[in-house]
Amino acid sequence: MSTVLHGQEPTSSWVARWSHLLPAGCQVLDLACGHGRHMRHFASLGHPVTGIDRNPDAIAAVSPLGEAICADIENGPWPLKGRTFGGVVVTNYLWRPLWSDILASLAPDGVLIYETFAAGNDTVGKPSRPDFLLQPGELLTVCQDLRVVAFEEGFLAQPERFLQRIVAVRESNNAQTPVRYPLSR
């Protein structure tokens, strides 16, 4: 049993690894933010943060960090229509009808950091419904119009889970020189 308090979980190693790619000081959206572990991370790096979750208790907990929006994004309208962010972070959440809204929320030169459960997870735990598990290569397909900087798909042992994760940039550079995306800090 975990001794970490709910809402105090550490930043995802994937999110931490790629945070340096976000433009300095850009606004960051944490979608399905829960109790704000990634909002805390980006706020500590000097980013203004916006979190969306349907749980009013979670939103109350994160409201001191930045903009906190309580919304049922699966059954209601997208609450950020017309707004864009330099960083969009999604972890442990999948609702396919939102793909176009998520991608439209990414500003030019903005970075998408996405990590969630994948096919095979049903053999080791929850979530196990196919609706909540990415199919092989699905994030690559969704991000085909973005510049993919990193992608992983596979199994992690502690705790056991099948994951798919991607870091992708909405490039605005039309120069002949390719943009350098550092693979580490």
What residue spans do the PLM features occupy?
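Conserved beta-strand signature within the Rossmann-like core of class I S-adenosyl-L-methionine
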Residues: 110-119
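S-adenosyl-L-methionine
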Residues: 1-23
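Class I SAM-dependent methyltransferase SAM/SAH-binding core
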Residues: 35-75
